[in-house]
């Protein structure tokens, strides 16, 4: 246990919390340009071809972000918006593409959970 005198001389230092999404720099989303759009395979025990994009952000950071939903229209030089959120079975992927904003189209024929995929309300 420290004495009052010791604390007066040298106060306690609080630990800094490390961010899971450092490239966003505290912002909720960031704009960027796709430098490469490709598919990659997940870790064991899963098996698939996950769609990801390498993105150069406006702050100069280059990150890998996941393209959720069925089908997408992204290609090189597409301007996209990314948000935080990792993909557990893809190492190094800590960001998600925001569907339905900027150059990214929403998911077609999406009926449920539409807001997560930028899909408009269907005509009833």
Curated annotation (Swiss-Prot):
Domain of life of the source: Bacteria
Biased composition annotated in UniProt, kind: Basic residues: 108-124
GO molecular function: rRNA binding; structural constituent of ribosome; tRNA binding
GO biological process, one term: translation
CDD domains listed in its UniProt record: Ribosomal_S12
GO CC annotations, alphabetized: small ribosomal subunit
3-methylthioaspartic acid PTM positions: 89
PROSITE patterns: RIBOSOMAL_S12
The entry's keywords: Methylation, Ribonucleoprotein, Ribosomal protein, RNA-binding, rRNA-binding, tRNA-binding
InterPro entries: NA-bd_OB-fold, Ribosomal_uS12, Ribosomal_uS12_bac
Pfam hit, one: Ribosom_S12_S23
Annotated spans, Disordered: 103-124
Subunit composition and interactions: Part of the 30S ribosomal subunit. Contacts proteins S8 and S17. May interact with IF1 in the 30S initiation complex.
Function per UniProt: With S4 and S5 plays an important role in translational accuracy. Interacts with and stabilizes bases of the 16S rRNA that are involved in tRNA selection in the A site and with the mRNA backbone. Located at the interface of the 30S and 50S subunits, it traverses the body of the 30S subunit contacting proteins on the other side and probably holding the rRNA structure together. The combined cluster of proteins S8, S12 and S17 appears to hold together the shoulder and platform of the 30S subunit.
Protein family (similarity comment): Belongs to the universal ribosomal protein uS12 family.
Protein name per the record: Small ribosomal subunit protein uS12
Organism from which the protein derives: Methylococcus capsulatus (strain ATCC 33009 / NCIMB 11132 / Bath)
């Amino acid at each position: 246990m420290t004495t009052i005198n010791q604390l007066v001389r040298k106060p306690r230092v609080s630990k800094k919390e490390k961010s899971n999404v450092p490239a966003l720099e505290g912002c909720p989303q960031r704009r960027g340009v796709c430098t490469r759009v490709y598919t990659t395979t997940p870790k064991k025990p899963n098996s698939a071809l996950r769609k990801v994009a390498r993105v150069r952000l406006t702050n100069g950071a280059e990150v890998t972000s996941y393209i959720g939903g069925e089908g997408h229209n992204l290609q090189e030089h597409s301007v996209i918006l990314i948000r935080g959120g990792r993909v557990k079975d893809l190492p190094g992927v800590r960001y998600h593409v925001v569907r339905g904003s900027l150059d990214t189209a929403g998911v077609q024929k999406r009926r449920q959970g539409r807001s997560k995929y930028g899909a408009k309300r269907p005509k009833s």
